[in-house]
C-alpha cells in the first residue's frame, strides 16, 4: 500500500537509491504491486543516470503489505521498492535487484526479464 509521501527504495541500477511518491496514476488513494506512480528522487549515487529532485515514473515491484494469491499463499516483502521507467514503460536501469512479484501480463515484460527472481 503506497500512498503519497511514501519513501521507497529503488530496485534498479539507474542511480537513484531513495525516491518519494508524489502522485498515483491509478486513480486511487493507494498503489500496490504493478501500479505506476510518479516519484521524485531524494537520494542518488554519483555518476548515475538520474538527477536529484527530478520527477520520474516508476512501477511498484515490492510492498510490505501481504498480498494473497489465488491459491491461498501469501507473499510479503521486507521493503517497499520500485523500478524507474520511461514514458514507454521500459526501465531506466539495466539490472533489477532482489526478488519481485509477478507483474500484470504483458505490461512490464522488460522489467520482469531483468529481474533475478520473480515470485
Curated annotation (Swiss-Prot):
<dbReference type="InterPro" id="IPR036853">
    <property type="entry name" value="Ribosomal_uL14_sf"/>
</dbReference>
<protein>
    <recommendedName>
        <fullName>Large ribosomal subunit protein uL14</fullName>
    </recommendedName>
</protein>
<keyword id="KW-0694">RNA-binding</keyword>
<dbReference type="GO" id="GO:0022625">
    <property type="term" value="C:cytosolic large ribosomal subunit"/>
</dbReference>
<keyword id="KW-0687">Ribonucleoprotein</keyword>
<keyword id="KW-0699">rRNA-binding</keyword>
<dbReference type="InterPro" id="IPR000218">
    <property type="entry name" value="Ribosomal_uL14"/>
</dbReference>
<dbReference type="InterPro" id="IPR019972">
    <property type="entry name" value="Ribosomal_uL14_CS"/>
</dbReference>
<keyword id="KW-0689">Ribosomal protein</keyword>
<dbReference type="InterPro" id="IPR005745">
    <property type="entry name" value="Ribosomal_uL14_bac-type"/>
</dbReference>
<comment type="function">
    <text>Binds to 23S rRNA. Forms part of two intersubunit bridges in the 70S ribosome.</text>
</comment>
<dbReference type="GO" id="GO:0006412">
    <property type="term" value="P:translation"/>
</dbReference>
<dbReference type="GO" id="GO:0003735">
    <property type="term" value="F:structural constituent of ribosome"/>
</dbReference>
<dbReference type="Pfam" id="PF00238">
    <property type="entry name" value="Ribosomal_L14"/>
</dbReference>
<comment type="subunit">
    <text>Part of the 50S ribosomal subunit. Forms a cluster with proteins L3 and L19. In the 70S ribosome, L14 and L19 interact and together make contacts with the 16S rRNA in bridges B5 and B8.</text>
</comment>
<dbReference type="GO" id="GO:0070180">
    <property type="term" value="F:large ribosomal subunit rRNA binding"/>
</dbReference>
<comment type="similarity">
    <text>Belongs to the universal ribosomal protein uL14 family.</text>
</comment>
Amino acid at each position: 500500500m503506497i500512498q503519497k509521501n511514501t519513501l521507497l527504495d529503488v530496485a534498479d541500477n539507474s542511480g537513484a537509491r531513495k525516491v518519494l511518491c508524489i502522485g498515483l496514476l491509478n486513480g486511487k488513494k493507494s498503489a500496490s504491486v504493478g501500479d505506476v506512480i510518479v516519484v521524485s528522487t531524494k537520494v542518488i549515487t554519483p555518476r548515475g543516470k538520474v538527477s536529484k529532485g527530478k520527477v520520474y515514473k516508476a512501477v511498484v515491484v515490492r510492498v510490505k503489505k501481504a498480498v494473497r494469491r489465488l491459491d491461498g499463499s501469501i507473499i510479503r516483502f521486507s521493503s517497499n521498492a520500485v523500478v524507474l521507467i520511461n514514458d514507454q514503460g521500459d526501465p531506466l536501469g539495466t539490472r533489477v535487484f532482489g526478488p519481485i512479484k509477478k507483474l500484470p501480463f504483458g505490461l512490464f515484460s522488460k522489467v520482469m526479464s531483468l529481474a533475478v527472481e520473480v515470485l
